[in-house]
Swiss-Prot record:
Database matches in InterPro entries: DiS_bond_form_DsbB/BdbC, Disulphide_bond_form_BdbC, DsbB-like_sf
Family statement: Belongs to the DsbB family. BdbC subfamily.
Gene Ontology biological-process annotations: protein folding
Transmembrane spans: 9-28, 43-62, 69-86, 115-137
One Gene Ontology term, aspect cellular component: plasma membrane
Topology term for the membrane: Multi-pass membrane protein
Tree of life domain: Bacteria
Organism field: Oceanobacillus iheyensis (strain DSM 14371 / CIP 107618 / JCM 11309 / KCTC 3954 / HTE831)
Protein name from the UniProt record: Probable disulfide formation protein
GO molecular function, one term: protein-disulfide reductase activity
Length: 145
């Protein structure tokens, strides 16, 4: 276990905050706004929710090695949310994957801020931020070695 630099500690805390905000936003839309999640939304939740715990433990222990699964989960989550966004906004993807297999079609757009920001877009940005910040921590630790 290598000691984290102060910059890496701050980035790790920032990742945890991002994961927590994504979890809170997801719960807000489903529990307060009563939006029923589609199948792809559930996959994104499955990949995002554990990140709060994973990065929280890593931040408390001050050890990025605890968070290695988070790098993979955020990368996969980014791919899922990108596909989901394409299902919502690109006609060829709507025909192929619009129905999903759940009770709510995956091409339903509950929110559309500024004409392009939907829930999968917000999830994708969160996954991207987590993924990039994790890579920055690894680079920072590599410089320290």
């Amino acid at each position: 276990m290598k000691k984290l630099t102060k910059k890496a500690e701050n980035l790790l805390l920032l990742i945890w905050v991002q994961a927590f905000l994504a979890l809170a936003g997801s719960l807000f839309y489903s529990e307060v706004m009563n939006y029923v999640p589609c199948e792809l939304c559930w996959y994104q939740r499955i990949l995002m929710y554990p990140l709060v715990l994973i990065y929280g433990v890593a931040a408390i222990k001050k050890d990025i090695s605890f968070a290695l699964p988070g790098l993979f989960m955020s990368g996969i989550g980014l791919l899922v949310s990108t596909y989901h966004y394409l299902v919502q906004h690109v006609s060829i993807f709507q025909e192929v994957g619009g129905a999903c297999s759940g009770s709510v079609p995956c091409n339903v757009i509950y929110v559309n801020y500024f004409g392009f920001i939907s829930i999968p877009f917000m999830a994708g940005v969160a996954f991207l931020i987590i993924f990039v910040l994790h890579l920055l921590i690894l680079r920072e630790q590599g410089r320290k070695a």
